[in-house]
Curated annotation (Swiss-Prot):
It comes from Canalohypopterygium tamariscinum (Moss). SMART domains: Ribosomal_S4 (SM01390), S4 (SM00363). Its main location: plastid. Pfam families: Ribosomal_S4 (PF00163), S4 (PF01479). CDD domains: S4 (cd00165). Residues 90-150 form the S4 RNA-binding domain. The gene is rps4. This is Small ribosomal subunit protein uS4c. HAMAP family: Ribosomal_uS4_B. Part of the 30S ribosomal subunit. Contacts protein S5. The interaction surface between S4 and S5 is involved in control of translational fidelity. GO terms for molecular function: rRNA binding; structural constituent of ribosome. Belongs to the universal ribosomal protein uS4 family.
Amino acid sequence: MSRYRGPRVKIIRRLGALPGLTNKTPQLKSSPINQSTSNKKISQYRIRLEEKQKLRFHYGITERQLLNYVRIARKAKGSTGEILLQLLEMRLDNVIFRLGMSPTIPGARQLVNHRHILVNGHIVDIPSYRCKPQDFITIKNQRKSQAIINKNMNFYRKYKIPNHLIYNSLDKKGLVNQILDRESIGLKINELLVVEYYSRQA
């Protein structure tokens, strides 16, 4: 399944706020999952499916990519759900978004694809690059790159940067300080339902 490129507002009306996809927050349409349903019982499969879709659309990844992340998380020690979220949060495009360098993850992905971003002094043009503690995220030293990032930072500096990241506004340098904890996830999600959804596939 390819990456979604359709109307973003339509998605968040159905699934709720997905800050990685869009910063718009339209009024939610009535949803059988968001309100009590006396006449219709919602299947557990559908509930798990919608939680899975939240991850897909928020992080802007394909079905195959998400399944691969679940498989990696299952093989690691610890809570599969938390490790899955850590893997997604440590993607370079998401780190750029959480640092405030881009208003959305698709926007961050463009910055990476267009070679505006350096990791530890080297250009990285792979949005799925997995960042690790002590990685430095900087901007390419060109006027166009600097202008794009400065515009984003000035507009989105009101948003709080999570505890596992540090941004130095003077040097325009981001640092992955540590592996994030569950409380730092910027999305309302039940990751256990996602793991259950893939229980027969991963």
